Amino acid sequence: MPHAESYDYIIVGAGSAGCVLANRLSADPRCSVLLLEAGGWDRDPMIHIPLGWGKILTERRHDWMYFCEPEDNVGGRRVECARGKVIGGSSSTNAMAYVRGNRGDYDRWAATGLSEWSYDKVLPYFRKQESWEGGANQYRGGNGPVSTQFCRYKDTLIDAFAQASVQAGYAQTKDYNGERQEGFGRLQMTISKGRRASTASAYLRPVLKRPNLTVLTEASATRIVLEGARATGVTINHRGGERTVLARKEVLLAGGVINTPQLMMLSGIGAQDELAAHGVQTRVNLPAVGKNLQDHVSVILMYRRRAPGGPFLRNMRADRIGFDFVKTYLTGRGFSGDVPGGVVAFLKSGPARPLPDVQLLFTAAPLAAWPYFKPFKAPFADGFATRIVATQPESRGAVKLASADPSAAPLIHQNFLASPKDWESLRAGFRVARDLAAQPSMQPFIEAEFFPGPKCQSDDEIDEHIRKTSITVHHPAGTCRMGADAASVVDPQLRVRGVDRLRVVDASVMPDLVCGNINAAVIMIAEKAADLIASSKEGRAVQ
């Protein structure tokens, strides 16, 4: 890296959004781009083998190791908040589900004054990002960087669960990322030839040889350099040494929902009273920074499976799965090239709901399988699970500084289940999951419900199960809210209010959560941001 450390664009965070920005901005050979990543390269085979996701998640490999603050609504627990700390960010560590959200999510954004973020306006960026196995149509893209496909995991239990949804009278959808989201359908994944299709593999790796793109790993941003009301660079800690890199055009924050507001506050951009409490000088009084935190909270229902069990149990013996991991990693073909999912649903908990507020994720495997492997025999009884997710949460939390030390984790106040409607969504979804298990097609597979168990029946008992066991499904958003109003953190062009040459491009700009997993939406935001940046001269602040 040359001594004159200045670039046209500095991107902070090589995650779901940052890798997209690096690709699109460096496509102009006249622009120099620096991409900073606090983690390392994505060399771990477990990242790339889809079934390795279980170990990535439970062992929290390549993770920031964040935990939420204790909260009464979840029994005083500190719920873990997994965030990817590796090239590709959470797109390298997530469960690979590909869900865009509902048309109504984006039209709701537009109704607040964000007219350029309506469904019709963002659809081209969803199409641009993907290469859908079914080919291009008016909703789907056929030539984008991210390969998307239906989950190909095969198990008769998955077919039985899909049939149960028909027997119970629920609506069906052939493509929840197409014309209609609501209903039961086959899960879609970001997998290509038996490997995870992260933004690192899809967007970044193909362009690493561009001479105008520099990537620094193990480089943590500690402060945004401000000259008056203008962002001119970033101070970084790179492998133990601190230095400053300068941006001639813009600094682009893509560190994610937790790290982006933390960096802004450490740099003096935030609520004046909160910054003063930690001895941070206020440069821009922007009280909304870190506020509006929201996430998808979930609860699970698990069953034991009748003998002889399914393919997951048979293949998870250490001698078999070890061989299969190697085979899949080298050839892209094998049992490990998919995950034991298959069916997903987006449902309304009641007729008054304008959009689906419940997501069901069916898994043809017991959660007790995650701490694999023990030699030569499966260390768990076979089973399956349905995860119930509240997709339209009304509860709002905040990310706050714990100290002025950049190496200290911030305080994450999720404020889970603060709204009665969030409880209603989970409760309703729980009863739907039980209804599905009671259908005729499921009876040959069910030995017994074991979590929480058949004694959990009343609303109070279900609520206690939710309180004791609910977790996040790792879809945080909103902490640098985009809006047309002066109280928002960023304007509709993602420019930070009160600061020139500074934008936020990640899930923190979402005004509110979309219905479903958020990786596709974050990629869309980055694709759209790249066009906004390319069409902008300096990214001047909006007052």
Swiss-Prot record:
Enzyme kind, highest EC tier = oxidoreductase
Q: What Enzyme Commission number(s) apply to this enzyme?
A: 1.1.99.42
Activity as a function of temperature:
Optimum temperature is 30-35 degrees Celsius.
Its annotated compartments are: Cell inner membrane
- Report the InterPro entries cross-referenced here: FAD/NAD-bd_sf (IPR036188), GMC_OxRdtase (IPR012132), GMC_OxRdtase_N (IPR000172), GMC_OxRtase_C (IPR007867)
Pathway info: Cofactor degradation; B6 vitamer degradation
Give the primary localization class: membrane
Q: Which coenzymes or cofactors are required? A: FAD
Q: Which residues form a coiled coil?
A: none
Q: Does the keyword Oxidoreductase apply?
A: yes
Spell out the post-translational modification annotation for this entry.
Answer: The N-terminus is blocked.
Q: How does it sit in the membrane?
A: Peripheral membrane protein
Pfam families tied to this protein: GMC_oxred_C, GMC_oxred_N
Which residue positions are annotated as catalytic? Answer: H475
Provide the function of this protein. Involved in the degradation of pyridoxine (vitamin B(6)). Catalyzes the oxidation of 4-pyridoxic acid to 5-formyl-3-hydroxy-2-methylpyridine-4-carboxylate.
Family matches, as PANTHER family? CHOLINE DEHYDROGENASE, MITOCHONDRIAL, GLUCOSE-METHANOL-CHOLINE GMC OXIDOREDUCTASE
| Family membership noted in the UniProt record | Belongs to the GMC oxidoreductase family.
Share what the entry says about its subunit structure, partners included: Monomer.
User: Under which name does UniProt file this protein?
Assistant: 4-pyridoxate dehydrogenase
Q: Which organism is it from?
A: Mesorhizobium japonicum (strain LMG 29417 / CECT 9101 / MAFF 303099) (Mesorhizobium loti (strain MAFF 303099))
Give the gene name.
padh1
